[in-house]
Amino acid sequence: MAQANLSETLFKPSFKHRETSTLVRRTRHDQETQGLHSTLEGEKTSSWYRMINRLMWIWRGVNPWEIEDVLSRIAASQADRSNEQLLDTVIGYRGGNWIYEWAKQGADWQQRATESGDDAQTGQFWLNAANLYSIAAYPHIKGDELAEQAQTLANRAYEEAAKYLPYELKELTFPIAGGGTLTGFLHMPSQGKAPFPTVLMCGSLETLQSDYHRLFQDYFAPAGMAMLTIDVPSVGFSSRWKLTQDSSFLHQQVLRALPDVPWVDHCRVTAFGFRFGANIAVRLAYLESQRLRGVACLGPVVHHLLSDPNRQQQVPDMFMDVLASRLGMPFSTDASLKTELGRYSLKTQGLLGRRCPTPMLAGYWENDLLCPKEEASLIVNSSAQGKLMPVNFSPVYQNFDRALQQISRWLQDKVC
């Protein structure tokens, strides 16, 4: 896309779009969640609607100074906000608006990519743009038109990056029962020869496929494993489907289609679940044990948060809004949402607690509101070959890296 056209389409002020935090109408309880900090979600403070997820953004490759620069522009804006107490609620697509500022930053890197003459540098610049466009769309609330445009830009930039970086990216299309097709990205390492042992990625509810590039680049590819990503229901390429109690519906059909994908060794497939993605992955461990060599989870959300109203009351509004959006319940009462969430518990569904033949690893942090130790233990104790992996909180970045290294080795061991 030419820079002139990019500026015309991206940065023309518009005031017709609803502000992100107003898209889900629920009873707010921010006052009870101040100061919450989670390794995987980031920090919740009284000044922001969104969780500020510096660790994960830096891990994906965004420069820390760049993060602070964008956040400061948002914070300094004098424009009208839907909630004057929350800095990231500037109304309209203009300076100070969350989507506007992050997309503008992404466009800067896109421009650099088009001007660069070095392939490695060009690929990295496109990847930087994809990361920033994804943050612009975060937390990917259904019906957020500006966020959906940013998602499209993120996916385009991600595909452009792959043309220049030392791995192969294939866009795969899978037919879905009931109609429609689903697009997934197969990442293949530059070393080795297809068909590859493959990790099916089950991401968290507020991420895109492109957000897991670092996981492939630094962990799976060096181990000789491919990575297949699929958007969770109601996000990105999966936006036409809402999340149901059959949370693994889309991933299960993709898993069953892998024998027809020549680059994937369908006899050597594992799954990896982040947060709610673990709900999908563990469900697959039960329903498709003959197709999976192992399932690893990090900070899994499979029972306690879904079934405990008191725990839900402590969760930041943004996280509960994301859940309501994914379930297709943006206008529901808190009571009806919490009742529905209880049905997503894999223990309530009669799965967890039963013996599962699939090897499962579950990593957790102490005092994690979304995933207490009991959550991870429930998964591990249900597996015929379970492994519990505690992760120390500090130093945060090093321990996160160490956890991913352990998970990668464990998955590699299952497909060797």
Swiss-Prot record:
EC number from the UniProt entry: 3.1.1.1
Coiled coil (residue ranges): none
NCBIfam families: PRK05077.1
Annotated spans, Disordered: 19-39
Protein family (similarity comment): Belongs to the FrsA family.
Lineage, broadest ranks: Bacteria, Pseudomonadati, Pseudomonadota, Gammaproteobacteria, Enterobacterales
PANTHER family: DIENELACTONE HYDROLASE DOMAIN-CONTAINING PROTEIN-RELATED, ESTERASE FRSA
Catalytic activity: a carboxylic ester + H2O = an alcohol + a carboxylate + H(+)
Protein name (Swiss-Prot/TrEMBL): Esterase FrsA
